[in-house]
């Protein structure tokens, strides 16, 4: 069943119900079987799969709370902290713990929680588990911040759940509550109500009514009771008759049926009727059939002493159809079902929540006759008490003295009338059942033998009497309602107001019905006839009043003026005529009694008196109130002009409602005045008549009573008006949608305001954002709340809503910038990499969660709509995308308080960054921020001066303790708006955010992946971590500690202590009045006073003194303003930047960087290699000891520079660049520096030259323009940078750089190094051994070496894009003899250098070809496969990396192959050379032409083992060989001898002797008759053409001969013929020397004849090819004797083999 609980649902309602599909099928079957509608509360979705899995469900004996998070979701944890109560107050947890103990003490068990794999899958899909690694479970729930959970697989394939507190030692099992059998429990399926059909009780009603007697007996008792009742029409007898009539119905519907009680100690925990019990058992039997446990454990909410108020109810009809209904829909549905004969039994013991549900949804349901509603006195008198309480009387209720005041704060009257309402619906059904029973009884009377006609007559009379009583009750009810509504503080709902209106308009009809029915019932009783004549008149007057009231109501309609005037006339006529008619009836009756008759005469004077009475009846205060009400409507019209433009029409609707209310109340006031006047006139006329004073008295009493009734009807009239407007709202989409338009309109109004657009545009500029995402929380308007209250819709709206827009430059743009989930508290920013959005909250962001509203009667005529926020109220989660986002949290609500302002909880913020560089502007809330990738910043600048933060580093995390003292925080609470509507008062709660001041508040933020932290205005303490942090204290006396990493520290205003810690830190200071303590710690640290700080703006500066800083003393003296002085104490600071004023700065003995910035500064470097920069202004710079650098950037002043000791440099590279100059320089160059004359001339854009005095300076760096740099007799470094520079070194070993441009470089005397750089440069070395460094390939430079041994170096050229464009792998082509270097790897290219006087060349990293000249050259190949040729002279060739080719040519040369497989071309006749192969397998080659081997010359004699090579028999021609592996001979007769390594020896032409030596060698004889001896090792021998001889013997290893045909070839083996064993191995011939491991293979001997040798010699014998074949065939007949046998054993060899050996070896 586990696999199918989500499958098989018939519709969306089934799925939403949470009931497993298989169980639900059984429920529908039971509904059909029992002919009853079944209603259920929604099942927790986390319990759905558990029920389907067969988990047991809890009964009423379990009071503990289930869990809605983590692995235990749906179960009932023994530890309340693991339940849905997690995070609640300690006292709540303590009470929950008691509930758990109570459950365990009464038959329940604690069970170790285990889960199935399917359950784990569900938890993942539901988002309750977000990950699992090695059994450890992850989740987003806050509980996982306090607890760790893991699962372990058990032997039965389930997973045991364990937990421990974070940081705890051992895991323990999670225990949940189970039943007595040890099966875990989950929530059961709660039945809300059952509606059985009346047909279920027809038989039981009859037997119950008769109580064992016949129907005839029952009717006889009824007849006798009715006979007794005819003695009078007093209240007691009418009640008695009514009770008799309904006796059977009450029992029939089960309200008095046997109940089942279960007890737990003295507590009544459950009530269930017989029918409910029957249904429950049927449902559980169906559940068992599909593998579930009991799913329903108790009765319905109809018998629950503490019922719930649900927003939705799941309904299964008697036909098996299912649907999901809201409260309002349920009300209508129950009414429809009642009309079809189904009985709904309400709960009599509802508390506040339950009563509200039935007041709003069921109290005025269709099918409940108005006569059976709350205020019927007979109903009230017969209401039984709730359990344990006494029954109130009507009088007690009206006095509000019923003893109910202690119940949950509910007013006594409200609770009592609630019981009446509950009874009203039941008694309506009882009335219908009574009628059925009485009709059945009458028919039974007629059918039974022996029953007289009188019995049938009394049956009819009993029914008639019941109808009379019903009609009378309707009349009494209508009058009671009118009276009740006229009292101050009356309690009534909008539904009651509707009932009242119906009663008022039906008054005339009710009066006639009562008169007719009662007269018929008592027909024949003459003593009552006269009385009812008067009663008939009174009822006729009642009809007139009703008509008058109806006409008055028409005045409230939107009717033409003429129609309203007619209605007013109708009022006067009806009331006047009715009153006169009543008075006439009374007068005539009295006159008849006295036998006196007389006409009615009204004197003119009496009419005048009546007019006076009319004027007196109009109250000035009443008129004033109506006028004020009209003015308020005008104000609402003004509001409507703007709200209507944004789609909300409610203000206009409310204005019209008040105008209609004003008209209605004016009409009632006028009618009342007219009635008083008419009454007075009638009394006067009666007094003048014959009837005299009695008529006047009666008339006065009647008109006074009617006037009171009319005033009482005023409230129903305006209530009907409110109902009419409520219907209008329903017709316009319903209240929820209607009032949401108010929120939308208020949002649009603000979003389109000029002020907001400007503010957001400024924010975008200030934050350097690409757009601003504005989140606006909008509160409903006061006028909308007022309209909702009047129309009874205050519980059908939202008081706040959240809207999101994107703005660019203050204008709204399309797109969905965030995904907002208010219910779950989620904000996801939809941003992409490269964007720079900013998120801000335009209005304070309210708490997350959904709003639930409940309207409850709280006084006589008072209603209160309560609001409650449900869901995840304590946390917002904000998730960023990949952009660089600014998130402003300043206006996020930090606290949630209740209606009394008591703190419920703080609201936390989870902010999850993306890949960008994000900035979070924090507020007072508790924040957890994970910055993710990028460089992220959190700023607390919004905190006040009395607040402080303490930041500590915990590995990758920062913990930020915020101490808020008397701070302002945004707080959300509940406010109440009170609206008086006539006598009705509506108190409507709504969500409201305010800026509140708190005393002391401590919150702790956690920050992860954050690099930058900015403090607030208070005294903060901030400690960094191991990363490169940016820490700013803000205002206040702060303490900053950078920790490890290269940090930037900003103390800000106040007396700060700033510690750099490890790493190269930067301190940003201002010139404030505060003294600070600065400690750089380890690393190279810098203090900067040139950063503009806000505190400087508040100082009126008098003078231009900046700072006096002395790093050696550890002080920085500051003059922030006139007569103000402060000192910063510094230590472990290496670098310091001055202010924008005139500073004095001195370093210490460390390597300092000192920068004056603006102002006329004096800077001393002292010891160490310092960097000094004066900045703008007339500066004096002293380098003193050390190799110092002076950075010059101001060409408009003259500075004084003294380098002092050491090698010092003055650098002008930052002085002139396109961002500085505004016009071409007058002289067309940047600087002219002459160190020999100790000055530097600077050409300014103003055409004025300025000179810097430079002393003791060795080096100069020029500008980007045309410079002239001249050295002195010292070793100078002169760098021209850009422009066409002239650089002259002078004496000394100088380093000259031309930089960009066509430069002229002159080394002059000394061993100079010259770099031309970009451009066509001319470089002259002058005297000395100079070095020319060439770095570009696509230019034409002229290089003149001058005197000395000069070198041109192209090794850096390959690193530039100019080399080998389209010529991949080719370097330079240099020929010193021709004086040309082609730089693109081919001769004749356009990019070449002209060289002269150059002796040495260094090639590139590519393949170069470098040729020397007649001088002694040094040629270096560097990288690549180079070709180096020394030419004449004693040269040095170095191949470098790569497989190089080296040729020394003439002269005594030294050739070094270095790395790679190099090839040396050597002339054997050229003696005295050194050839060193270096790494790799290198080859010496004597084969080339011109190697001294002319005709008649001798061949080469070479020994790699001895390391020499010479002409044959001419040792004086010897050359030294080192690290050479291979050799190639000449065309003569050569002798090539290898060494112990693996050699390749190639004899080429001639009759060569090749000897491999030890190692696995390759010998190639090539042309000629060669002698090849592999010697030791496994060698490959290639004889080639000619008559070749191969030598082999003991100790030679395993050699292979590769013959290719031609010549007469021989193998000579140093062994006896009897030691050789011949065998065929594939196509090869193998010859083995027995007794050894040596073997000789002739490759492909059997493939064809070209691969064979002609003869083999062994000792003094030989064998030819034919003999070899015979030996192979003969030996193939015998097993190989192996290497151990020295010769074939003669004793075992047949004579045939011996004969073959003898015959073939000769």
UniProtKB/Swiss-Prot annotation:
Changing residue 298 to R/P/L: Loss of adenylate cyclase activity. One of its GO terms (molecular function) is adenylate cyclase activity. Bifunctional adenylate cyclase toxin-hemolysin that plays a crucial role in host colonization. It causes whooping cough by acting on mammalian cells by elevating cAMP-concentration and thus disrupts normal cell function. Changing residue 242 to D/G/R/V: Reduced affinity for altered affinity for calmodulin without affecting the adenylate cyclase activity. It holds the Pfam family HemolysinCabind. This is Bifunctional hemolysin/adenylate cyclase. Released in a processed form. The keyword tRNA processing does not apply. The gene is cya. Its main location: secreted.
């Amino acid at each position: 069943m586990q696999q199918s609980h989500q499958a098989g649902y018939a519709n969306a309602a089934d799925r939403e119900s949470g009931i497993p599909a298989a169980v639900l099928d059984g429920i529908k079957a039971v509904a059909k079987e029992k002919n009853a509608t079944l209603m259920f509360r929604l099942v927790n979705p986390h319990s759905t799969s558990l029920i389907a899995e067969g988990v047991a469900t809890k009964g009423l004996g379990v009071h503990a709370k289930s869990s809605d998070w983590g692995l235990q979701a749906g179960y009932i944890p023994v530890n309340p902290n693991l339940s849905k109560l997690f995070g609640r107050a300690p006292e709540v947890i303590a009470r929950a713990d008691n509930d758990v103990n109570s459950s365990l003490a009464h038959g329940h068990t604690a069970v170790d929680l285990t889960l199935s794999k399917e359950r784990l899958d569900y938890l993942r899909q539901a988002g309750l588990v977000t990950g699992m690694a090695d059994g450890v479970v992850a989740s987003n729930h806050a509980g996982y911040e306090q607890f760790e959970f893991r699962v372990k697989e058990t032997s039965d394939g389930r997973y045991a759940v364990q937990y421990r507190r974070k940081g705890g030692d051992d895991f323990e099992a999670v225990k949940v509550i189970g039943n007595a059998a040890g099966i875990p429990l989950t929530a059961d399926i709660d039945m809300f109500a059952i509606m059985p059909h009346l047909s279920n009780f027809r038989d039981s009603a009859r037997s119950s009514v008769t109580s064992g007697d016949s129907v005839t007996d029952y009717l006889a008792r009824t007849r006798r009771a009715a006979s007794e009742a005819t003695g009078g029409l007093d209240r007691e007898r009418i009640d008695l008759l009514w009770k008799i009539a309904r006796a059977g119905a009450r029992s029939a519907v089960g309200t008095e049926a046997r109940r089942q009680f279960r007890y737990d100690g003295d507590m009544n925990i459950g009530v269930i009727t017989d029918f409910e019990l029957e249904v429950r058992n049927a449902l559980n039997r169906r559940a068992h059939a599909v593998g579930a446990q009991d799913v329903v454990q108790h009765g319905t909410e109809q018998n629950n002493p503490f019922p719930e108020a649900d927003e939705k109810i799941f309904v299964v009809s008697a036909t098996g159809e299912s649907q999901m209904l809201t409260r309002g829909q349920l009300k209508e549905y129950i009414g429809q079902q009642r009309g079809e004969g189904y009985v709904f039994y309400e709960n009599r013991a509802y508390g506040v929540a339950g009563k509200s549900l039935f007041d709003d949804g069921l109290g005025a349901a269709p099918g409940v006759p108005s006569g059976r509603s709350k205020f019927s006195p007979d109903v009230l008198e017969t209401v039984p008490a709730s359990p344990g309480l006494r029954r109130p009387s009507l009088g007690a209720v009206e006095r509000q003295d019923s003893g109910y005041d202690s119940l949950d704060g509910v007013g006594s009257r409200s609770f009592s009338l609630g019981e009446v309402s509950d009874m009203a619906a039941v008694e309506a059904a009882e009335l219908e059942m009574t009628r059925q029973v009485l009709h059945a009884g009458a028919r039974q009377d007629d059918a039974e033998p022996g029953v007289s006609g009188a019995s049938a007559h009394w049956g009819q009379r009993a029914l008639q009497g019941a109808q009379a009583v019903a009609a009378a009750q309707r009349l009494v009810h209508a009058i009671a309602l009118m009276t009740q509504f006229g009292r101050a503080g009356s309690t009534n709902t909008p539904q009651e107001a509707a009932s009242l209106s119906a009663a008022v308009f039906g008054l005339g009809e009710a009066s006639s019905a009562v008169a007719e029915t009662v007269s018929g019932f008592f027909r024949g009783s003459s003593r009552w006839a006269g009385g009812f004549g008067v009663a008939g008149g009174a009822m006729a007057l009642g009809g007139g009043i009703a008509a008058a009231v109806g006409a008055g109501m028409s005045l409230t309609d939107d009717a033409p003026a003429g129609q309203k005037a007619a209605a007013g006339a109708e009022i006067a006529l009806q009331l006047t005529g009715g009153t006169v008619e009543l008075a006439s009836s009374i007068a005539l009756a009295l006159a008849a009694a006295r036998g006196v008759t007389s006409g009615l005469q009204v004197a003119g004077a009496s009419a005048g008196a009546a007019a006076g009475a009319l004027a007196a009846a109009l109250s000035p205060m009443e008129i004033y109130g109506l006028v004020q009400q009209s003015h308020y409507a005008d104000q609402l019209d003004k509001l409507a002009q703007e709200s209507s433009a944004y789609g909300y029409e409610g203000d206009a609707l409310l204005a019209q409602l008040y105008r209609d209310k004003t008209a209605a109340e004016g009409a009632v006031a006028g009618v009342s005045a007219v009635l008083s006047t008419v009454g007075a006139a009638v009394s006067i006329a009666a007094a003048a008549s014959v009837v005299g004073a009695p008529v006047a008295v009666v008339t006065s009493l009647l008109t006074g009573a009617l006037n009171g009734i009319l005033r009482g009807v005023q409230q129903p009239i305006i209530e009907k008006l409110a109902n009419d407007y409520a219907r209008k709202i329903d017709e316009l989409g319903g209240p929820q949608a209607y009032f949401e338009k108010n929120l939308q309109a208020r949002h649009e109004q603000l979003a389109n305001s000029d002020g907001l657009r400007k503010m957001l545009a400024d924010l975008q500029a200030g934050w350097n954002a690409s757009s601003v995402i504005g989140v606006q929380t909008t509160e409903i308007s006061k006028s909308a709340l007022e309209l909702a209250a009047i129309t009874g819709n205050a519980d059908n709206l939202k008081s706040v809503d959240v809207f999101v827009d994107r703005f660019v430059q203050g204008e709204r743009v399309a797109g969905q910038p965030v995904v907002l989930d208010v219910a779950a508290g989620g904000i996801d920013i939809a941003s992409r990499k490269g964007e720079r959005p900013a998120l801000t909250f335009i209005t304070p962001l309210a708490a997350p969660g959904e709003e639930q509203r409940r309207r409850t009667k709280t006084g006589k005529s008072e209603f209160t709509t309560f609001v409650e926020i449900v869901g995840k109220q304590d946390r917002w989660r904000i998730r960023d995308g990949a952009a660089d986002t600014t998130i402003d949290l300043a206006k996020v609500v930090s606290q949630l308080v209740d209606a009394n302002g008591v703190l419920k909880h703080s609201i936390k913020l989870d902010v999850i960054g993306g890949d960008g560089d994000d900035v979070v502007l924090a507020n007072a809330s508790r924040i957890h921020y994970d910055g993710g990738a990028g460089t992220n910043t959190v700023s607390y600048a919004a905190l006040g001066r009395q607040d402080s933060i303490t930041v500590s580093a915990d590995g990758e995390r920062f913990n930020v303790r915020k101490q808020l003292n008397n701070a302002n925080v945004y707080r959300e609470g509940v406010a109440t708006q009170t609206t008086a509507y006539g006598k009705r008062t509506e108190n409507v709660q709504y969500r409201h955010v305010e800026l509140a001041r708190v005393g002391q508040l401590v919150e702790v933020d956690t920050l992860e992946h954050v690099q930058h932290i900015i403090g607030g205005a208070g005294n903060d303490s901030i400690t960094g971590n191991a990363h490169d942090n940016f820490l700013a204290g803000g205002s206040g006396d702060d303490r900053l500690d950078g920790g490890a990493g290269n940090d930037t520290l900003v103390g800000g205003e106040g007396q700060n202590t700033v510690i750099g810690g490890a790493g190269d830190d930067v301190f940003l200071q201002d010139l404030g009045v505060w003294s600070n303590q600065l400690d750089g710690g380890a690393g190279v640290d810098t203090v900067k006073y040139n950063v503009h700080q806000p505190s400087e703006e508040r100082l009126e500066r008098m003078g231009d003194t900046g700072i006096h800083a002395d790093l050696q003393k550890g002080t920085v003296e500051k003059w922030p303003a006139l007569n103000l002085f402060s000192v910063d104490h510094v230590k472990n600071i290496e670098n310091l930047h001055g202010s924008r004023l005139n500073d004095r700065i001195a370093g210490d003995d460390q390597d300092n960087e000192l920068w004056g910035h603006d102002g006329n500064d004096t800077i001393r470097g002292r010891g160490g290699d310092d960097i000094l920069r004066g900045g703008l202004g007339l500066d004096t710079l002293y380098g003193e000891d050390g190799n110092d650098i002076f950075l010059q950037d101001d060409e408009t002043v003259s500075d004084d520079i003294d380098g002092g000791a050491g090698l010092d440099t003055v650098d002008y590279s930052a002085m002139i660049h396109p961002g500085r100059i505004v016009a071409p320089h007058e002289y067309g160059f940047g600087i002219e520096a002459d160190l020999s004359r100790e000055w530097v001339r600077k050409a300014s854009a103003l055409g004025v030259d300025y000179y810097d005095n430079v002393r003791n300076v060795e080096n100069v760096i020029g500008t980007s323009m045309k410079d002239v740099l001249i050295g002195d007799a010292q070793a100078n470094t002169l760098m021209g940078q850009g422009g066409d520079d002239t650089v002259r070194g002078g004496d000394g070993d100088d380093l000259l750089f031309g930089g960009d441009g066509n430069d002229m470089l002159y080394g002059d005397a000394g061993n100079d190094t010259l770099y031309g750089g970009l451009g066509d440069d001319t470089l002259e070395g002058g005297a000395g051994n100079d070095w020319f460094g060439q770095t570009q390939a696509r230019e034409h430079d002229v290089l003149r070496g001058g005197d000395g041994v000069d070198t041109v170096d192209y090794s850096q050229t390959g690193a530039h894009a100019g080399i080998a464009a389209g010529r991949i792998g080719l370097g330079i082509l240099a020929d010193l003899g021709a004086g040309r270097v082609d730089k693109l790897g081919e001769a004749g290219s356009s990019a070449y250098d002209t060289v002269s006087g150059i002796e040495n060349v260094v090639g590139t990293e590519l393949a170069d070809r470098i040729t020397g000249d007649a001088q002694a050259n040094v040629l270096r190949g560097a990288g690549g496969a180079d070709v180096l040729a020394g030419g004449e002279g004693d040269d040095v060739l170095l191949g470098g990396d790569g497989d190089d080719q080296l040729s020394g040519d003439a002269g005594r040369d030294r050739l070094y192959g270095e790395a790679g497989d190099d090839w040396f071309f050597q002339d054997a006749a050229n003696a005295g050379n050194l050839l060193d192969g270096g790494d790799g397998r290198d080859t010496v080659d004597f084969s080339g032409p011109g190697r001294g081997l002319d005709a008649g010359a001798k061949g080469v004699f070479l020994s790699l083992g001895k390391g020499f090579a010479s002409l044959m028999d001419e040792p004086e021609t010897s050359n030294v060989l080192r690290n050479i592996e291979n050799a190639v001979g000449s065309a003569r007769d050569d002798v090539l001898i290898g060494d112990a390594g693996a050699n390749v020896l190639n004899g080429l032409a001639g009759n060569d002797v090749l000897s491999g030596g030890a190692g696995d060698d390759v010998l190639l004889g090539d042309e000629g008759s060669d002698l090849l001896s592999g010697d030791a090792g496994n060698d490959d021998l290639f004889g080639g053409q000619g008559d070749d001889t191969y030598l082999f013997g003991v100790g030679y290893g395993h050699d292979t001969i590769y013959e290719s045909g031609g010549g007469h070839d021989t193998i000579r083996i140093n062994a006896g013929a009897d030691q050789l064993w011949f065998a065929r191995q594939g196509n090869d011939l193998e010859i083995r020397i027995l007794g050894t491991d040596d073997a000789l293979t002739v490759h492909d001997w059997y493939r064809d004849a070209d691969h064979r040798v002609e003869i083999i010699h062994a000792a003094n014998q030989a064998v030819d090819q034919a003999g070899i074949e015979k030996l192979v065939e003969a030996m193939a007949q015998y097993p190989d004797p192996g290497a151990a046998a020295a010769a074939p054993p003669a004793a075992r060899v047949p004579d045939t083999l011996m004969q073959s050996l003898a015959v073939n070896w000769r």
